[in-house]
Amino acid sequence: MNATIDTVPRLCPPPHPHPHPPTRFRVPLGAVDTHAHVVGESFVPERSYTPPPAPPRNYLAMLDATSMTYGVIVQVSVHGTDNSLLVQTLRAHPDRLRGIAVAPHDLSDAALAELKDAGVVGLRLNTISGGGIGLDRLADYESLCAELGWHLQFLTHADRLAPVAPRLSQLRVPYVIDHMGHFDVDAGPQAPGWKLMMQLVADGAWVKLSGAYRLSKTPPYADTIPFARSLIEVAPDRSVWGSDWPHVGFWGTMPNVGDLLDALADWAPDPATREAILVTNPQRFYGFNRS
């Protein structure tokens, strides 16, 4: 049966057409945007939204416009486990880009080797968006990452990690949590979900200081400041920044990546801390600039 207008997942608006660098500080040389997507045209039916195209040339133009030296492309959920556009983009820019794939747990050794050769350095599990892979096969994905020297990346609300929190503390591979745990800042710092997020990060999780526009009401995202600062305080060497471009699955006013970077001036007022978040930490975690 053909899909009707009512059953087609909601269309997302395009990203801001003119991204700019931050106005409150100068982006240091070697900076890494650790979280963005490229979007093609073939989507899985179980997706949660319908994004406009975000081709590699637009993504690279965004990196250039915002003074980013390197970038990490995260497989977008609407493409499911078809990583072909991700791999194509990584292979075209092997020195500048790394990738995070979404893969079935029983992917062949040859296919995994192809992903690694292209520049994939981790696998993403996703409990939020249709087309993602959940946490039920965490052990399988841990084993894959351990064999390949990869890490795990989680897109989830922090409180949804409660059932697997004891397991996370015993993982044999590093892991990173997207978008500061997708936490509702209105719930406050005493909310169980935030307390769990802080505990996971204190115990060794990496955290992406990304998605401020998803957590906050409006720029300049002042309500995110105490939460981001708390994360940085407990994990200054495991905090990284990401633009989340092209901001899929969002229907508010599209943010400018420069404004998202400017929030980092409030989250990390100290220039040395910002350089760790933008340069030192992500280069180490994603394997950039290795001689």
Where are these regions (language model features)?
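Mid-to-C-terminal alpha-helical segments outside catalytic/metal-binding sites
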Residues: 2-30, 53-70, 236-238, 252-291
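Catalytic pocket-lining loop regions of alpha/beta-barrel enzymes
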Residues: 7-10, 135-241, 290
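Divalent metal-dependent hydrolysis catalytic cores, especially in the metallo-beta-lactamase
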Residues: 46-80, 96-102, 120-128, 150-152
